[in-house]
Amino acid sequence: MEKFEGYSEKQKSRQQYFVYPLLFQEYIYAFAHDYGLNGSEPVEIVSWNNKKFSSLLVKRLIIRMYQQNFLDNSVNHPNQDRLLDYKIFFYSEFYSQILSEGFAIVVEIPFSLRELSCPKEKEIPKFQNLRSIHSIFPFLEDKFLHLDYLSHIEIPYPIHLEILVQLLQYRIQDVPSLHLLRFFLNYYSNWNSFITSMKSILFFQKENKRLVKFLYNSYVSEYEFFLLFLRKQSSCLPLAYSGTFLERIHFSRKMEHFGIMYPGFSRKTLWFFMDPLIHYVRYQGKAILASKGSFFLKKKWKCYLINFWQYYFFFWTQPRRIHINQLANSCFDFMGYLSSVPKSPLLVRNQMLENSFLIDTRMKKFDTIVPATLLIGYLSKAQFCTGSGHPISKPIWTDLSDWDILDRFGRICRNLFHYHSGSSKKRTLYRLKYILRLSCARTLARKHKSTVRTFMQRLGSAFLEEFFTEEEQVFSLMFTKTTLFSFSGSHTERIWYLDIIGINDLVNPLN
């Protein structure tokens, strides 16, 4: 416990000061506008109704928040707009979005400075290839073959945002900035019942993307920080060997008595809680904890995580958010793939002199397949096909040129093939390609007010095949490979590319 408190105090000593004055700098809101809101003018901001705004008004907003009459209005009229007067500042929600984006940029500065201040001898070497999302799959393929159980964790999120503000106190010791953050969270809470309405939570995340990402990453970083510490400490807490004693309740007392009777007894270590073959992977609000221990060990980790969230973060998480599965008998959804470690039978012929033997053995294999139902659901949601996978036209794209239509369909198809190239079964990918190809033909036929049959007879099937086929040189693992996206044929090899650094546009490239 003393080590834990010392470790925590060491982190508190890294707190950063003087964040709040940066909120009054003009360039902060220029950055927020350019990068957070995808605008074009850094100083003057154009709203949705083409009315011009200046980021100077945002600084006035901060000053006005701390005026007495403004605070009185916030308390006496909680349902009214408490940020700005519409007659003066037009849209308060727009300015609150600007200010939240600017605040997110400011509070990210201390974390960036911490990385820059890291000594060179302690820096982790940065390999460009390790940035790829696919780089994790060769690791899983190498490690999961030797593991037994897997815990699939849905990382809980605190429903009360005050917990997130308190977590920032470990990293940022700036009272005005924390008060400003509380103001925004309370504003959205009272304005649209943020705490109780899931719809309001989604609205807050949509309107304040950068701030929500920062709060979530801070929370996950805090929980993983102490989780890593406790994991390391558990490996340094050897328990005495208990093979002689069946009753663990009186283990300590018996061991002391045993030591008195046999002074020369040498204690052995038992890695009871911590197995050296344990791996932790986090992705998209989920995490995987795999180990080679027994089912009892995994249940201990599950109870530990539930109690950890309850007593450290002060909120209850349901035990059903942690699923314990045996790797040999189950599959798990991981970053757009359905992965499993099945045991495949292998028949080996052994020849000894004049006699031959057939040896039937089983080998583990890390298998990854593409979830067809999920991907067809994405295509159906984007109106490329029906729910059953029947291709339809894309009416909203009929105003584009033929080249733009072909380019969009071809890019989506190439992205799907590129990301899901690690699938051991390519039949689903060819089915998706067929849907996109026919949907493209129907879109072009609808644009030219013709039928698909007439359109294909006039241009030929090779016309679409040309745009859905691309040869590209990709550095895959340690070799160069030419990938041909042909419509026919079968490819069973699995390829992991090292140039994929984003997942949203690849796993779900239609949104």
Swiss-Prot record:
Question: By what name is this protein known?
Answer: Maturase K
Which organism is this protein's natural source?
Hordeum vulgare subsp. vulgare
Q: What is its main location?
A: plastid
Subcellular compartments: Plastid, Chloroplast
Keyword tRNA processing on this protein?
yes
Q: Which HAMAP family match?
A: MatK (MF_01390)
Query: What family is reported?
Result: Belongs to the intron maturase 2 family. MatK subfamily.
Q: Name one Pfam family in it.
A: Intron_maturas2
Entry-linked InterPro entries: Domain_X, Maturase_MatK, Maturase_MatK_N
KW RNA-binding (keyword) present? yes
Keyword list (alphabetical) reads:
Chloroplast, mRNA processing, Plastid, RNA-binding, tRNA processing
One Gene Ontology term of the molecular function aspect: RNA binding
List the record's Gene Ontology CC terms alphabetically: chloroplast
* Main function: Usually encoded in the trnK tRNA gene intron. Probably assists in splicing its own and other chloroplast group II introns.
Single GO biological process annotation from the record: mRNA processing
Q: List the disulfide bonds.
A: none
